[in-house]
């Protein structure tokens, strides 16, 4: 399995060598909104990582010519975000945000089917539908079919994982990480990590399994590497008596595409086993939560997720999937 992990991380990040249990570095995010029209306030929200059991965030540095800046959370998901504002007419609108990260490999193995009693009400936020991830209709019908005969949270979560690996595929033409429109995806079956894990989460929730997406970015392998398009998300389900368990069927399908693997190949089985309860350390968790009302609130609809920077100038939203037009860059430092 160690050789499998090394091969997996090499292909995901083109790393020459790895430490299988930890990965550290510095992430630098640079924004320059100066070229956009000056007719209105400029507001910028950036996902703000925090330390947890699997990652240590330190040495945070925020610099810029903004009129105000602060770190807030939203009210529903407690998603941290860095907010900055520039006054109308400001000719220069720049911000630099960097932090050091030390990330652990997560391996939750020997999962058991016996589960402690749990109260669904305690996990209501992770059982509810989202705007693009319903838990009724065709999604519920499919989930019921997938978990038929399974009576435990673990059994249902595994059945949904297996179905997702076997029936979804990675579509490299998808823009960004994908919007995660579950009903559309059940028709096309193709997308990137945001799509594949939205399907997993919606099906798991429909089957009564608490689940959530985790939005982040991959770490690089060498100093100065451009990470601007390296956003990645994965999923977690809650196993009573154990806690949140990571799964990444999206990376299984990514490896299958890169290595031209079929479902019945031995390497596919190895990746499939690794990403059930395991994730590599070459990533940083940035946020969770869908359908966000930012803080301060943005104008318009809820934000689908906060994995990319979000900005509005005079109330008009910039395209966060166009880094050049938006004008931001993310760099890895060692």
For every predicted segment, state its role:
Residues 154, 158, 190-194, 198, ...:
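Conserved structured core elements
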